[in-house]
Amino acid sequence: MKTKIPDAVLAAEVSRRGLVKTTAIGGLAMASSALTLPFSRIAHAVDSAIPTKSDEKVIWSACTVNCGSRCPLRMHVVDGEIKYVETDNTGDDNYDGLHQVRACLRGRSMRRRVYNPDRLKYPMKRVGARGEGKFERISWEEAYDIIATNMQRLIKEYGNESIYLNYGTGTLGGTMTRSWPPGNTLVARLMNCCGGYLNHYGDYSSAQIAEGLNYTYGGWADGNSPSDIENSKLVVLFGNNPGETRMSGGGVTYYLEQARQKSNARMIIIDPRYTDTGAGREDEWIPIRPGTDAALVNGLAYVMITENLVDQAFLDKYCVGYDEKTLPASAPKNGHYKAYILGEGPDGVAKTPEWASQITGVPADKIIKLAREIGSTKPAFISQGWGPQRHANGEIATRAISMLAILTGNVGINGGNSGAREGSYSLPFVRMPTLENPIQTSISMFMWTDAIERGPEMTALRDGVRGKDKLDVPIKMIWNYAGNSLINQHSEINRTHEILQDDKKCELIVVIDCHMTSSAKYADILLPDCTASEQMDFALDASCGNMSYVIFNDQVIKPRFECKTIYEMTSELAKRLGVEQQFTEGRTQEEWMRHLYAQSREAIPELPTFEEFRKQGIFKKRDPQGHHVAYKAFREDPQANPLTTPSGKIEIYSQALADIAATWELPEGDVIDPLPIYTPGFESYQDPLNKQYPLQLTGFHYKSRVHSTYGNVDVLKAACRQEMWINPLDAQKRGINNGDKVRIFNDRGEVHIEAKVTPRMMPGVVALGEGAWYDPDTKRVDKGGCINVLTTQRPSPLAKGNPSHTNLVQVEKV
């Protein structure tokens, strides 16, 4: 169905209230057009009138950012300029068919990213201090020469382990242009041709859940497709907010709503913040203190066990460590889960609803009611987003939440789930090969600032170094491709700033990006990248329910200014480094695409020819199994299809974790345990630091941005203002009214931003949407609302991941 914008809408003046209303109803249609809005700062690019010229071309492109989905965009081009953007018009509106994949307000504003005043125009080198944003223009030849010469020098002096590829997800889903995982990028291919680089494991999105549930299920914890909710009777979401994080027609929220219409399943949301996933569509919202999800689960488990609401047959057949019958011989007496819950374990504390209530803030009677509902309603889709795991106790919390699905036997069945985040059907499309990294050493993606500061001191047992016992050298060079984690998305910005400012520590930082981001200001050499609209690639889906798809992301316009593609940049560098043939294999970017497409057609015979696909724009295929069901084969035959855990079963008790707990060097307050227990972790609401900083600060993914991407699009910033959310009770104590400027502060930094006083926040908790662009004044007080000024670089115990939601702060009116 083609999107049409009525003339009356184009002619009307839009108020902010009207804009917000339009956002809710129609996905911010004006962001996809060039409608001029009455805001003070608008990214004026070109004449915004919708063209009627006969020479208009409609070219397929894509939004390839890190929301979890990818969306097709149909660009209307006249005289080489994008005039307006529409989304998918293929397929139908039938949920059970090949439905349309409609972009959200972010993707529809792509034109404003392409023509944004912040676009990088030409190569530059730093002339001021890192972070000042002072650069001078240089030629591409000079930029290539500086990078190649200095990289060769650093490799000669320190070895390839001193070269680091930083985390970046600004360009996701592509076969050629993808920026994540860094090990699968063209920069990695270049480095692998030159002897390799220091790799990293984990990611800022899901480090703790990936590590925690690995010890429960083995490998990445899979989940049922959200489309399978049509077979569910109950949906329970822990910190899972697809209504804002994955809100497009290709994302989870579409499947959640459509599937619930079929099943009429009750939906319960457990979150400190009343999210847009609820917004009147949920049946119950249960606010909870951040970081206490495991305590809630333990209280629920107590009711289920004492009232015989657990699936004992499932626990006996498929699990290790629920009770004494399946407890490993190596475990201590009463070291099983049931003993821990009933107070018969080492701590001697029964995890009653009253015990859980004191910790979580959830009333005991509500815990009892919820336990009975979960224990008596089957199948139940129990899932967790990646918010609960982004805590100091994140790994152990993810294992605890998954226990609800395990206790009730909802794993491996239609309408159930594993307790992990939802999964999806995917196509075996072939991506660009990046060769093998000769360097086997890796660090946590969150520990790179420590690797600059104290690299040779970092060990396997204390800092999570993998591949060897310790690092030999510090990081001396950083590649930062399509990522804002150099400063904006990394925790404790003020500490990072101090480390990066000393260019005798990390001697070379190369940033490749499209815009002058907060991280770009810390570059030594700054290279202007092409947007997705300025080059050809294939864009692949991710969280797409049970209909997988591939988008032909064609070149819509010529590269602006002096921008070049990542393939051209890395090919030119390969030439200077003497590895051009090995890197390119004699192919151009389009030739690589045709080569990869031919390989993909062998795996997916239904794909049309390259030229037909280019015209078609998008290829869609539904899951032939109907719905993806995680661990279905294991459930049907655990002997023939064991899990990849040491026992081949679901490990409630993990001997591997017991061994780690006995050997790793952990700071005081960090806990690794073989059972999914509750431990508060550092800087919890129970921490003595609470007397000085009495409010918990948590983050959330805001609908106007994808992390920091789109954070410089003024129409989105105006429609969805960056504000600190605070409960009226906490605001009243501090004399704060809605819209007041407040200071949020702790020992790590200070942020000034407007307050949003709302009952949608739990008392005692404040929240900032993550991803706002860091904007410090001369005293390094941030005026942009960037949460990472206030977060800590102390890593989580097991994954060594980012505990971005574990923060204590104070808030005062400015």
Which residues does each predicted region cover?
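N-terminal export/assembly segments and adjacent metallocofactor-ligating motifs
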Residues: K2-L309, G335, E354, A460, ...
